[in-house]
Swiss-Prot record:
<keyword id="KW-0067">ATP-binding</keyword>
<feature type="binding site">
    <location>
        <begin position="99"/>
        <end position="109"/>
    </location>
    <ligand>
        <name>ATP</name>
    </ligand>
</feature>
<dbReference type="InterPro" id="IPR013750">
    <property type="entry name" value="GHMP_kinase_C_dom"/>
</dbReference>
<protein>
    <recommendedName>
        <fullName>4-diphosphocytidyl-2-C-methyl-D-erythritol kinase</fullName>
        <ecNumber>2.7.1.148</ecNumber>
    </recommendedName>
</protein>
<keyword id="KW-0414">Isoprene biosynthesis</keyword>
<dbReference type="InterPro" id="IPR036554">
    <property type="entry name" value="GHMP_kinase_C_sf"/>
</dbReference>
<dbReference type="GO" id="GO:0019288">
    <property type="term" value="P:isopentenyl diphosphate biosynthetic process, methylerythritol 4-phosphate pathway"/>
</dbReference>
<dbReference type="InterPro" id="IPR014721">
    <property type="entry name" value="Ribsml_uS5_D2-typ_fold_subgr"/>
</dbReference>
<dbReference type="GO" id="GO:0050515">
    <property type="term" value="F:4-(cytidine 5'-diphospho)-2-C-methyl-D-erythritol kinase activity"/>
</dbReference>
<comment type="function">
    <text>Catalyzes the phosphorylation of the position 2 hydroxy group of 4-diphosphocytidyl-2C-methyl-D-erythritol.</text>
</comment>
<dbReference type="Pfam" id="PF00288">
    <property type="entry name" value="GHMP_kinases_N"/>
</dbReference>
<feature type="active site">
    <location>
        <position position="141"/>
    </location>
</feature>
<feature type="active site">
    <location>
        <position position="16"/>
    </location>
</feature>
<dbReference type="InterPro" id="IPR006204">
    <property type="entry name" value="GHMP_kinase_N_dom"/>
</dbReference>
<keyword id="KW-0547">Nucleotide-binding</keyword>
<dbReference type="GO" id="GO:0005524">
    <property type="term" value="F:ATP binding"/>
</dbReference>
<dbReference type="InterPro" id="IPR004424">
    <property type="entry name" value="IspE"/>
</dbReference>
């Protein structure tokens, strides 16, 4: 193991947006086959890590409804210990800003930031591909955050091709409803046979903001009226408004932060509105190669 710090503070766990999300089939084990473009944005949770000389894994922050042992950050650390035999432990504090059940990948991003940070803190120097393989055991979105850059994703979300996206700012609205992902994917009305997309469908990358649709959106709008209302409101300012992931957050792209912020400032008070800039890379991407 290489020399390593004993503490890493202010580690971002950025959100993602699904610029489109197509359900193209289903595996025999029930997992849905997807195609999507993942866009990183600068709205994030923040994690702090302090190395322990023992093997204990301690979440020092209470999170309502999420027992520490079930938290993806602890599960990620546990898997990393098991994979490497590392004898260190860690204290993890989380500043939670991303809404749970929002379709922003908050829990998955927290897990990926944990894998990346502990790779450095514990002096493991594991390659990115190995961290992505570990991350897949935690959830289909985790490998993307470890991958560390905007991507066209296939399979259950783990087959990733880097993609260059145009600069953009986004208005993201959380309608303050929690959407359990299984409730959307198990709905009989879900479209599961959207034709396959190939990455060369985006010769002009600007088209990606208007491309396709979110196949989960119609089901989510039917089940959760507040999502539908947020989309109607946002479409006053952009015809490109759509939902991310399985909801509940909706978003629209704008040419610059000033325009996006002006719209975000008008979001009705019963919802949470946010202006977020697009990122090209994960802030901790350098923690693995």
């Amino acid at each position: 193991m290489s020399s390593a710090p004993v503490e890493l503070r202010d580690c971002p766990a950025p959100a993602k947006l699904n610029l489109f999300l197509h359900v193209v089939g289903r595996r025999p084990d029930g997992y849905h086959l997807l195609q999507t473009v993942f866009q990183l944005i600068d709205w994030s949770d923040t994690l702090h890590f302090a190395r322990r000389p023992d093997r204990r894994l301690v979440r020092t922050t209470d999170i309502l409804g999420v027992p520490a042992d079930d938290d993806l950050v602890i599960r990620a650390a546990r898997l990393l210990q098991a994979e490497t035999g590392c004898t260190y432990g860690v204290d993890i504090a989380i500043e939670k800003r991303l809404p749970m059940g929002g379709g922003l990948g908050g829990g998955s991003s927290d897990a990926a930031t944990t894998l990346l940070a502990l790779n450095r803190l514990w002096g493991l120097d594991l390659p990115r591909a190995q961290l992505m393989k570990i991350g897949l055991k935690l959830g289909a979105d985790v490998p993307f955050f470890v991958f560390g850059q905007n991507a066209f994703a296939e399979g259950i979300g783990e087959k990733l091709t880097p993609i260059t996206l145009p600069p953009a700012a986004f208005v993201v609205i959380h309608p303050r409803v929690h959407v359990p992902t299984p409730a959307i994917f198990s709905d009989e009305g879900l479209t599961r046979d959207t034709p396959l997309t190939i990455i060369t469908d985006f010769p002009d990358q600007q088209i990606v903001f208007a491309y396709g649709r979110n196949d989960l959106q119609a089901v989510a709008e039917r089940k959760y009226g507040e999502i539908a209302r947020a989309l109607v409101w946002l479409r006053q300012f952009s015809p490109l408004a759509r939902m991310t992931g399985s909801g509940a957050c909706v978003f629209a792209p704008f040419d610059n932060v000033e325009h996006a912020q002006a719209v975000a400032d008008q979001v009705p008070s019963e919802w949470e509105g946010r202006c977020a800039a697009g990122l090209t890379h994960h802030p901790l991407a350098r923690f693995a190669v």
